[in-house]
Amino acid sequence: MVVIAISGQPGSGKTTVAREVARVLNLPLVSSGSLFRELAAKMGIDFIEFHKYAEKNPDIDKVVDSMAIERAKAGNVVLEGHLAAWIVRPYADICIYLKASSEIRARRISIRDKKSFEDALREVREREELNRRRYLSLYNIDINDLSVFDLVLDTSYLSINDAIRISLDYICTVLGFKYSRKFC
C-alpha cells in the first residue's frame, strides 16, 4: 500500500510533479490545495481572503486534513499539498518537499495565473506568511523545519521535466528497495 506525500511552496512545481508521479505509478492523486480552492469558490471568497478566513476558522483545515488522513490510511495514493507530509507522515512511504526562490515562483505563478509579476510576488509572500502563522498556531508546525522529508528538491533552476525525473528516480529506487519489487 504505497503512500507518497508531496509538499512544497506555492509555485515550486509540487502539483505538476505530484500529478506525473501519480500517473507513472498509476495511483490516484489527492490534492489538498484543490480542495481548499474548491471550498473558497463554494463560499464565494477570494483565495487570499479565504486563507485569512481559514486562519480564524481552523475547521476548514481540519476538514481537508481528515480527508487526506483517511486517503493515506487507505493507501495507494499520492497526496499533494502544503502540509501533506506533516499531516500524513505516519502513513507515508516517502515524503518529498519542493522549493524555489520567491522570485522564480512568482514568475511561474504570474505565467500560470496570467497576472503581473509584482502581484504574484506580493501574493506569494503574503500567502507564505499567512500559511506560516496559521500552521504554527493551529498545528504547532514550523513549515521551515524540513526534517520530516525524505527528499528536499530545489526546483529554482530545474525544468519541470528535471524535477519530475529526479523525484521519480528517487521514488522508484526507494520503493523498489522497500518492497523488493520494481515500481517504475
From Swiss-Prot:
Enzyme class of the recorded protein, top EC level: transferase
Query: Where is it predominantly found?
Result: cytoplasm
Q: Which GO terms describe its molecular function?
A: ATP binding; CMP kinase activity; dCMP kinase activity
Presence of the UniProt keyword ATP-binding in the record: yes
The family database entries (InterPro entries) matched by this protein are listed as: Cyt_kin_arch (IPR011892), Cytidylate_kinase_dom (IPR011994), P-loop_NTPase (IPR027417)
Give the CC-aspect GO terms: cytoplasm
Q: Spell out the reaction equation it catalyses.
A: CMP + ATP = CDP + ADP; dCMP + ATP = dCDP + ADP
The record's annotation in CDD domains points to: CMPK
Protein's recorded name: Cytidylate kinase
Q: Which organism is it from?
A: Pyrobaculum islandicum (strain DSM 4184 / JCM 9189 / GEO3)
Q: Which gene encodes it?
A: cmk
